[in-house]
Design a protein with these regions (language model features):
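Short active-site neighborhood of thiol/selenol oxidoreductases, capturing the structured segment around
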Residues: 47-68
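Short, internal strand/loop/helix patches
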Residues: 89, 104-138
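Thiol-/selenol-based redox modules, centered on thioredoxin-like
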Residues: 134-188
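N-terminal "domain-start" segment that seeds a small globular fold
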Residues: 21-47
């Protein structure tokens, strides 16, 4: 009898799990999700409040090799457009102890938060690492990009779209990054 009850319970739990509502994936034109998270200084990042002031680029990312190579382009995007009112918020999946060293070596200038449980990915309806969501002033999703491009193409395209939202001149993000790169000297 116990085996029948356990078997029935397992069958029902699998059935309910399979029919549970998945988080809906966002599309361009959708309202941005309700999103709040504390940054690494303990200050609340509230997407709705930020989007009232101007466009916000939310980047859900990690410190993997591809994301790491792409990071300078997003830092350049942040620097290029912050005076235009565009905010960049990066949410990293790393735990505190691993991230502290990473943040120090990368000299991050954008606002960032940590979410090792990846709740932010669920809120934005994605499992892709990294994922970027450009939210226009007022809170509508203006652009979405998923995946990584260490050449900076994703950051440049998002930067161009963000510039268009605030009617600003486009900045050549790649040129900014190339200008800041230190020359590599061969070892003897």
């Amino acid at each position: 009898m116990k085996k029948i009850i356990v078997s029935l319970a397992l069958t029902l739990s699998v059935a309910f799990t399979a029919t549970a509502e998945p988080t809906k994936a966002l599309k361009v034109g959708d309202d941005a999700p309700e999103f709040k998270i504390k940054d690494t200084n303990g200050k609340e990042i509230n997407l709705a409040k930020l989007a009232k002031k101007g466009p916000v680029l939310v980047r859900l990312t990690c410190g993997c090799l591809g994301c790491d190579r792409e990071l300078p382009y997003f830092q350049a995007l942040h620097e290029a457009y912050k005076k235009e009112g565009i905010r960049l918020v990066a949410v990293f999946a790393e735990p505190d102890e691993k991230f502290a060293k990473y943040a120090k070596t990368k000299k991050l200038k954008m606002q960032y938060a940590l979410d090792p449980k990846k709740n932010s990915w669920q809120i934005f309806g994605t499992k892709t690492m990294p994922s970027n969501f450009l939210i226009e002033k007022g809170g509508k999703v203006a652009a979405i990009s998923k995946g990584c491009d260490p050449s900076g193409l994703i950051a440049r395209n998002l930067g161009d779209k963000a510039a268009k939202l605030v009617k600003a001149n486009k900045v050549d993000i790649k040129a900014q990054v190339d200008k800041n790169k230190k020359p590599v000297t061969p070892k003897k």
